[in-house]
């Protein structure tokens, strides 16, 4: 059963300055996302899509992102490149509180914008 759906869109240009700010990276992104970031040649786009996914996750929860650290929401990929979300700490606790057991995520981007949609599935409590 679908518990929640969230979508977010961001301007990629907003993240250009973030590509040179390690402090911001550590604040908003999981350590493994930062490792992947440094391997990626389209860095602002990389950050924008992941940030949009984190925002979309908060919207899908129905609570927003208050009381959780964005770095505890990790965007990663399976072996075929399909994105997936892993959540830790307060983000994981909030997911469990909704009855959520599965998270679906899709990312997309164009020249100027990046977007993400998140669907939380499970059994409502």
From Swiss-Prot:
Main EC class the enzyme belongs to: transferase
Catalysed reactions listed for this entry: apo-[ACP] + CoA = holo-[ACP] + adenosine 3',5'-bisphosphate + H(+)
SUPFAM superfamilies (UniProt xref): 4'-phosphopantetheinyl transferase
UniProt xrefs under Pfam families: ACPS
Cofactor(s) needed for function: Mg(2+)
Tagged with keyword DNA-binding: no
Keyword list, A-Z: Cytoplasm, Fatty acid biosynthesis, Fatty acid metabolism, Lipid biosynthesis, Lipid metabolism, Magnesium, Metal-binding, Transferase
Cellular compartments per GO CC: cytoplasm
Top-rank taxon: Bacteria
Its EC number(s): 2.7.8.7
GO molecular function, one term: holo-[acyl-carrier-protein] synthase activity
Record-listed Mg(2+) binding positions: 8, 55
One BP annotation, GO: fatty acid biosynthetic process
Cellular localisation: Cytoplasm
NCBIfam families given in the database record: acpS (TIGR00516), pantethn_trn (TIGR00556), PRK00070.3-2 (NF000832)
Function: Transfers the 4'-phosphopantetheine moiety from coenzyme A to a Ser of acyl-carrier-protein.
Family: Belongs to the P-Pant transferase superfamily. AcpS family.
Protein name: Holo-[acyl-carrier-protein] synthase
Species this protein is from: Treponema pallidum (strain Nichols)
